[in-house]
């Protein structure tokens, strides 16, 4: 009986992982709508394509490199052992866990897009998306969720406040600092002193509001998956 209950529990947990992954993936649309709605219309195409490429490029890099760095066998508490289990051991591979971690990776990359809106070359952003999906997010997330050195010290990250939001926020801050303000944002006198700050209002407030609600809804997939997932694993 215990074996049957354990098998059912494992299947239910896998289904819940996929439901949570679908909700978190839906947040990509929310980020795109918020960023597009609260910026100028002329940049809409660039913004939509950047958010789309986050997931497209991120998926390829996460499959080839990132996932093994994140959840591979721990090497010195710093990084997961590189491997291709998704191709070589696919019969025993946990695809539901892979999909959920993939959408988390894409979310981390997307956070940066809004901070650098209207002043980022598309190709440059694609390169950034590849780097954060293949190296930055997988390695730092391994420290906590992959049994790395922070996990060994007892550090916990319930739903990505550190692995996702802190890392995405720091990356966004660095990117914004390098790029500087949008052209025309500040008017300066001959001495370089700012004499006027120009506002760049968003071109579609309802679109931005729709994005907020999409993000709100998707958040339940992120937080509730972690909470209910723990209950499922300990129920029996």
Task: Label every PLM stretch briefly.
Residues 225-236:
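Single conserved hydrophobic/aromatic residue that forms the stacking wall/gate
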């Amino acid at each position: 009986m215990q074996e049957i209950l354990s098998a059912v529990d494992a299947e239910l947990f896998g289904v819940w992982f996929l439901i949570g992954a679908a909700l978190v993936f839906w947040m990509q649309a929310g980020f795109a709508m918020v960023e597009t709605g609260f910026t100028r219309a002329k940049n809409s195409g660039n913004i939509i394509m950047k958010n789309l490429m986050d997931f497209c490029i991120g998926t390829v890099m996460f499959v080839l490199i990132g996932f093994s760095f994140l959840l591979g066998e721990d090497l010195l508490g710093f990084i997961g052992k590189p491997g291709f289990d998704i191709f070589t051991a696919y019969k025993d591979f946990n695809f539901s866990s892979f999909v959920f971690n993939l959408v988390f990776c894409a979310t981390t990359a997307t956070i940066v897009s809004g901070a650098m809106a209207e002043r980022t070359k598309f190709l440059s952003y694609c390169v950034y998306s590849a780097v954060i999906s293949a190296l930055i997010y997988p390695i730092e997330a391994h420290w906590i969720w992959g049994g790395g050195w922070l996990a060994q010290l007892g550090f916990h990250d319930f739903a990505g406040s550190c692995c996702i939001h802190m890392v995405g926020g720091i990356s966004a801050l660095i990117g914004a600092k390098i790029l500087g303000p949008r052209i025309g944002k500040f008017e300066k006198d001959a001495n370089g002193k700012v004499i006027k700050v120009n506002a760049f209002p968003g071109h579609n407030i309802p679109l931005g509001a729709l994005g907020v609600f999409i993000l709100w809804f998707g958040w339940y997939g992120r937080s509730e998956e972690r909470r209910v997932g723990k209950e499922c694993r300990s129920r029996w």
